[in-house]
Amino acid sequence: MKFTIQIIAVYALWTGATASFSAQNSCTAQSGATRASVIELYTSEGCSSCPPADKWLSSLKTPAGETGVASGAIVQAFHVGYWDYIGWVDRFASPAYTTRQRQQAALGGQSTIYTPQAVLNGRDWRDWHGSGGRLPLGKEPAGASISLRQVGDDQFEATVTPAVGASSTWSAYWTVTEHGHSSKVKSGENAGEFLQHDFVVRQYTPAGDYTAAPKTPQKLVWRSIAATPGHARQINLVVFDPKTGKTLQAVSAAC
């Protein structure tokens, strides 16, 4: 399904805070020497061709009910609402996610957006359905290093350090993704379907644009406001080149 839409302004909320926090409840993540792959799926409960893509995304989870993916990729399902008019409102959708999809498309030279769309490291990835569950994990050196830690119940901080030879300008965003959501669709193209979702983006927060010399660390602070009891979640931080959309590095932690 394809749809052309005007860009919607994104209003980001981010805050820094400090608090005493039990070390035994904290979690951390440290990036590696190679760039992590970032997969974004743009999907909708109102799209009849989206359930197979949602099922494929769920197949990337680790076994035995663990969170994350065995490959180490960062996986995110952005639900969009531009098919809500067909008759079913996607409760996970946000205009900010549509805006992000549109921005990604513009960086890749696309004039339209569609669902389901997979984006790999900032570029349209149409061969996701032919991957056979194998993710194209490259060995490209990381453009930045990231160290993330939890400093409060819903408070996080990270240090981003650009690599030598990488772009001096970078941007970042945080997401909260949750597993194990489901919906019984009562109307629209998927009427009567029972849909199951993993890696659902419940919070998306742009973290700003930065210019820094190589090896110059930048501290980011953030508070999560999204948490659904009973659902395992991931805290993700993605650093990318704002001129191309290309991923520089990313980390994910089950917090």
Q: What is each PLM-predicted segment?
A:
Residues 11-14, 21-112:
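Active-site-proximal cofactor/substrate-binding loop regions of enzyme domains
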Residues 3-4, 38-41, 49, 53-56, ...:
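Aromatic-enriched hydrophobic runs in primary sequence
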Residues 90-117, 121-255:
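Short, conserved sequence motifs used for protein processing/export or organelle targeting and
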Residues 2-10, 14:
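Sec-dependent signal peptide recognition
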